[in-house]
Regions:
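Bacterial N-terminal signal peptides that target proteins for export
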Residues: 2-11
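Acidic/polar low-complexity flexible segments
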Residues: 26-53, 140-342, 385-436
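Short, well-ordered beta-strand segments enriched in hydrophobic/aromatic residues
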Residues: 115-122, 374-380
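Exposed beta-sheet edge/beta-hairpin loop segments within beta-rich domains
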Residues: 365-372, 389-393
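Beta-strand-rich interaction surfaces with strong enrichment in secreted/lumenal proteins
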Residues: 105-108, 363-369
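Sequence context of c-type cytochrome heme-c attachment sites
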Residues: 23-67, 81-108, 130-131
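The canonical Cys-X-X-Cys-His
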Residues: 67-77, 189
Length: 436
């Protein structure tokens, strides 16, 4: 089977063509030179968490308990904090070699009667766009996951290659979540989550009553309101009925994420929310698992006639534009195609047409990497009526936290901002420009 001559130019064109077709949007027509640019400093938080902020190890714990904003003490200290926390210290037991402690994120915001428009720019550590993602590797008998983010033990030990997509996230509060305006993302980050202290085993999570009820195998972002104890411990969850009441009251956070591999090639971003877990919105994402649960074989392979090969290799897995995009560079997986040990296929396939419901709200998002800088233009519809969204509306102010995942990393290995206010026709730290 031919696998070694994957043509990167052909692959890139095939992977992004669906997204490029959607870029004749209002966002692409904006004269961004007329919209003010705000520079935010995002910093590496290490293993600082909701619980740590309230512990004796944090000098400002008493102020946190009183509801004081993190920025009250630390505004302007982001770069200093990041430089300290990214190195070996009590909050960083597994420092990442060469990891930067800070990222400058330029933010521009505009809106009209129908949409909010965001433009972001940031420099990356990598010398190429971080749009590669872990794959499935054929070992001669089975297809198994291959590649891990840099914090994963297998990547740290060199047992598997460190590989993961770049990502930009916005977490949005409309004032309904107590404490978010002061603490931002730290309200959602807890002991027990992935790559955090006291991470439980899969079996322990599965045995927990809440996690069994919601059918989750690990601990991810959640809000303190969904726990029963003062420490907001992951294991002390409320009932599903109680959590649904919290959601019905609107006391959740919107979490929307642009992903360099799993959404950008089809011109989209995903849509989710944080409550008892980090959930996706109702409907279907643009990215779907490429593993058939019944046959334990991939669903799609590359169309060799279009991209030059049916699979990736170790030499080509990091090349730009390796996403499987249905209808552009894919054919149905053929188990009899002569697969050899070492052949690689992406873990997800992408389908713009297959995305649906509230999960598909972010339909016009364009990310371009050039000269070491990502530029992402993002359209978010105003006045969304879905029960799992925070609707952006004229006349309102929102508390928003930003995060960038860079350099083959996920989970806590990002750089984050303190919460910033954004107003649409209202006074705020960032006031969106009203378009005529």
């Amino acid at each position: 089977m031919k696998t070694s001559s994957l043509a990167p130019a052909a692959m890139t064109a095939a992977a992004v063509i669906a997204g490029c077709a959607m870029l004749a949007s209002d966002s692409g027509m904006l004269d961004w030179s007329r919209v003010p640019t705000h520079s935010l400093t995002l910093f590496y938080p290490a293993q600082s968490s909701y619980q740590w902020l309230r512990s004796a190890d944090h000098a400002g714990a008493s102020m946190v308990a009183q509801g004081t904003s993190c920025a009250t003490c630390h505004n302007g200290q982001e770069e200093k904090l990041g430089s300290k926390l990214v190195r070996a210290n009590p909050l960083e037991p597994t420092p990442i070699s060469g990891k930067n402690g800070m990222v400058k994120l330029n933010v521009q915001v505009a809106y009209d009667a129908e949409n909010a428009y965001f433009r972001f720019q940031w420099k990356t550590q990598g010398s190429m766009p971080g749009d590669a993602y872990p794959v499935y590797r054929f070992d001669g008998k089975e297809w198994k996951g291959y590649g891990q983010p840099r914090l994963h033990p297998a990547a740290r030990k060199g047992e598997q290659p460190a590989i993961y997509e770049d990502r930009l996230s916005m977490i949005i509060d409309d004032g309904s979540v107590p404490g978010f305006a002061n603490q931002g993302c730290w309200l959602t980050c807890h002991r027990g989550e992935r790559d955090m202290p006291e991470q439980p085993t899969t079996a322990t999570v599965q045995a927990n009553s809440l996690y069994a009820a919601i059918k989750r195998n690990d601990v991810r972002k959640y809000l303190p309101s969904t726990r029963t104890d003062g420490a907001a411990s992951w294991e002390n969850g409320r009932s599903v009925a109680e959590i649904e009441k919290i959601k019905s009251a609107g006391a959740f956070l919107d979490l929307i994420q642009w992903r360099a591999h799993r959404s950008n090639p089809v011109g989209m971003a995903d849509d989710g929310y944080v409550l008892e877990w980090r959930n996706f919105d109702a409907g279907r994402n643009p990215f779907v698992s490429n593993m058939d649960g019944k046959t334990r074989q991939p669903v799609y392979m590359y169309d060799a006639a279009k991209v030059g090969a049916r699979a990736l290799t170790e030499a080509t897995m990091r090349r730009a534009g390796t996403a499987l995009v249905v209808g552009e560079n894919t054919v149905a997986f053929d188990p009899g195609a002569g697969w050899k040990a070492g052949d690689l296929l992406p873990q997800y396939y992408l389908s713009r047409a297959g995305a649906s419901g509230s999960a598909a709200d972010n339909k016009t998002v364009k990310g371009v990497w050039k000269g070491g800088t990502w530029t992402v233009e993002w359209v978010r519809p105003l006045n969304l009526a879905n029960s799992d969204d925070k609707a952006l509306r004229e006349g309102r102010v929102y508390n928003i936290g930003f995060a960038v995942h860079d350099d083959n990393i996920t989970s806590r290995g990002h750089q984050v901002s303190f919460p910033v206010t954004i107003g649409f026709g209202a006074k705020a730290a960032i006031e969106a420009t009203r378009l005529k």
